[in-house]
Curated annotation (Swiss-Prot):
Belongs to the DNA mismatch repair MutL/HexB family. This is DNA mismatch repair protein MutL. The keyword Ligase does not apply. Gene3D superfamilies: 3.30.230.10, Histidine kinase-like ATPase, C-terminal domain, MutL, C-terminal domain, dimerisation subdomain, MutL, C-terminal domain, regulatory subdomain. Keywords: DNA damage, DNA repair. GO terms for molecular function: ATP binding; ATP hydrolysis activity; ATP-dependent DNA damage sensor activity; mismatched DNA binding. GO terms for biological process: mismatch repair. One of its GO terms (cellular component) is mismatch repair complex. SUPFAM superfamilies: ATPase domain of HSP90 chaperone/DNA topoisomerase II/histidine kinase (SSF55874), DNA mismatch repair protein MutL (SSF118116), Ribosomal protein S5 domain 2-like (SSF54211). It comes from Rickettsia typhi (strain ATCC VR-144 / Wilmington). CDD domains: HATPase_MutL-MLH-PMS-like, MutL_Trans. This protein is involved in the repair of mismatches in DNA. It is required for dam-dependent methyl-directed DNA mismatch repair. May act as a 'molecular matchmaker', a protein that promotes the formation of a stable complex between two or more DNA-binding proteins in an ATP-dependent manner without itself being part of a final effector complex. The gene is mutL.
């Protein structure tokens, strides 16, 4: 077979296969061009999710007839010079997008240079140019793409449903819009307006906050920490969710390098590490984080789609991002999610399940035998006689405190304990419901971490060594092979037969633990990991298992002094708003929200 040169048309179709995967790819390239063109307003129109029609209009600098003719040729661009290949500030620079799109569609470009007298238009069908003509158009550029992939029907067959393809285009526009809050964006699909974002012209932080509210939502901002972190050659800003506000997937993680939306495994891992003390393994933080870095320290020319980057010093970037997120979270370490959702949970049963309020009341019913009310204004506490276990007198009684006491403490003064599990406390303008078990988990976690860090995790020798038989010899071998690492965690074990482990020492904090259950849990959990698991990673997992056993003792009756002591410890502890499984440790109900429960 003879070697020959490929035709220009074939080359463009091959390039299109790399750059243009779906309608969203076209939307991305055209919107990015509009941003690079200095636009303040960008309109996107789609029909059938872009399969039939894509129109992107802007009010940017526009093009002359000569520029228009050159723009649709391969490797032509106004955004790159020979000298600044390592100093790229624009979205595009390869000069591939327009000719690649034109090769697989029917393209019409109309453009008018700012302050020019005439507009010009060029049409391309399957990459074949027609003559440029004079047209009528406002300043800026309008690009119409019809019948995408008509020249490559095989690619057309692989497109997904209109719903899926539309979602991909929406996601692209939202990401670009987040990075450019000064630009207005408008997206219409099948004559229906799906996205309308007004550009802001205030300071950067205000612009960014409003754009995030418009794109991600007001609830996210209310449950997020602001990041503002700088080094001599690096800066990070944006918002990241508090640990109690999380998702089951990473879809709501928006990451940007020099305003370029990216999907980078290094940064995603950094996010996981930053939250590893506060989120369960299957939960993900929400964020919109913008990293500004010297362009010479990052390579964006990794893939034609430019969604991947390479850092000159990836470990430095990773560590800086982790530090920035942790600093931001520390500022809101005692904040839990807004009480709005909790109020709705209270309110819905009242609306749906309560009997009609005008139902006749039988004053002779048995209920009156159990409950009596004293409406004396001077009464401090109403006594209720219930057909259930009596609450301890010192826990159930009301305690008088002056207003200054309530102002003094963030979590207020303990008033009662429910079901030996929940503490009710009162603040100046709210009531707080605290989950004892979750609080003990967080307290234990912080305590064990502190002891490990300072070498204070003392061993407790068992009076009688405990023999634990595991379900397989493989699990026993795994624990035994990691015995030196476990020893550093104050757990001393030896092999005892084929499937058994003998335990001679446990951490002093867990001296009352069920050793059988502890070792079984360790074996089950850790056997899923590599036999050569790093000590740091092993410590992370073992601590979490320790805490589960440490906090079992939490479900018990507490005296008033014990409850208040627990509240004071929460106030002096970092990240007291959630346990290490991401459950909130408390819910605060403001008086104004409680009043809403009783409104019709």
């Amino acid at each position: 077979m003879t070697i020959k040169f490929l035709s220009e048309s074939t080359i463009n179709r091959i390039a299109a296969g790399e750059v243009i995967e779906r309608p969203a790819s076209v939307v991305k390239e055209l919107v990015e061009n509009a941003v690079d063109g200095g636009s303040t307003k960008i309109d996107i129109i789609l029909e059938r999710a872009g399969k039939n029609l894509i129109i992107v209009s802007d009010d940017g600098i526009g093009m002359t007839d000569k520029e228009l003719e050159i723009a649709v040729e391969r490797h032509t661009t106004s955004k790159l010079n020979e000298s600044d290949f390592l100093n790229i500030h624009t979205f595009g620079f390869r000069g591939e997008a327009l000719p690649s799109i034109a090769a697989i569609s029917k393209m019409l470009i109309t453009s008018k240079k700012r302050e020019a007298d005439k507009a010009f238009q060029i049409k391309l069908i399957g990459g074949n140019k027609q003559q440029i003509t004079v047209s009528v158009h406002n300043e800026g550029t309008k690009i119409e793409i019809r019948d995408l992939f008509f020249a490559t029907p095989a690619r057309l067959k692989f497109l997904k449903s209109d719903r899926t393809e539309l979602a991909a285009s929406l996601d692209i526009v939202k990401k670009i819009a987040l990075a450019h809050p000064k630009i207005s964006f408008n997206l219409i699909h099948n004559s229906k307006n799906l996205l309308k974002l007004k550009g802001q012209n205030k300071d950067f932080e205000t612009n960014l906050k409003q754009r995030i509210i418009d794109v991600i939502g007001d609830v996210f901002i209310k449950n997020a920490s602001y990041i503002n972190f700088k080094t001599p050659d690096f800066s990070i800003c944006g918002y990241t969710s508090i640990p109690t506000y999380s998702r089951a997937s990473s879809e709501d993680q928006f990451l940007f390098i020099n305003n370029r939306p990216i999907k980078d495994k290094l940064l995603q891992v950094a996010l996981r590490v930053a939250y590893q003390d506060y989120l369960a393994r299957d939960r993900y933080a929400l964020c919109a984080i913008f990293l500004q870095i010297d362009p010479q320290l990052v390579d964006v020319n990794v893939h034609p789609a430019k969604a991947e980057v390479r850092f000159h010093d990836p470990n430095y970037v990773r560590n800086i991002l982790i530090e920035a997120i942790k600093n931001a979270l520390t500022n809101k370490s005692q904040v839990t999610v807004t009480t709005t959702d909790a109020i709705e949970l209270f309110k819905n049963p009242l609306v749906n399940k309560q009997p009609p309020i005008n139902k006749a009341i039988n004053v002779n019913s048995k209920a009156s035998e159990y409950i009596s009310f004293n409406f004396n204004r001077n009464t401090v506490c109403q006594k209720l006689t219930l057909q259930s276990d009596k609450i301890e007198q010192e826990v159930g009684k009301c305690i008088e405190h002056d207003n200054q006491s309530y102002k003094q403490y963030k979590f207020g003064i303990a008033k009662a304990q429910l079901h030996t599990t929940y503490i009710i406390s009162q603040t100046e303008d709210s009531i707080v419901i605290i989950d004892q078990h979750a609080v003990y988990e967080r307290l234990g976690y912080e305590k064990i971490k502190y002891c490990l860090k300072n070498g204070e995790l003392v061993k407790q020798r068992l009076l009688i060594p405990e023999i634990v038989e595991l379900s397989s010899g493989e699990k026993a071998d795994y624990l035994y092979e990691n015995r030196d690492k476990l020893f550093k965690l104050s757990l001393t074990i030896e092999k005892f037969g084929e499937k058994s482990i003998i335990v001679t020492e446990v951490p002093n904090l867990l001296r009352d633990v069920n050793v059988q259950k502890l070792i079984q849990d360790l074996a089950d959990h850790l056997s899923d990991f590599s036999k050569n698991i790093a000590l740091k990673e092993l410590i992370e997992h073992v601590i979490k298992i320790y805490i589960c056993h440490y906090s079992i003792r939490a479900v018990r009756k507490l005296s008033v002094d014990e409850m208040n002591s627990l509240l004071r410890q929460m106030e002096n502890m970092s990240f007291s708003a959630q346990c290490n499984h991401n459950r909130p440790t408390y819910i605060e109900l403001k008086l104004k929200d409680i009043e809403r429960l009783f409104r019709l």
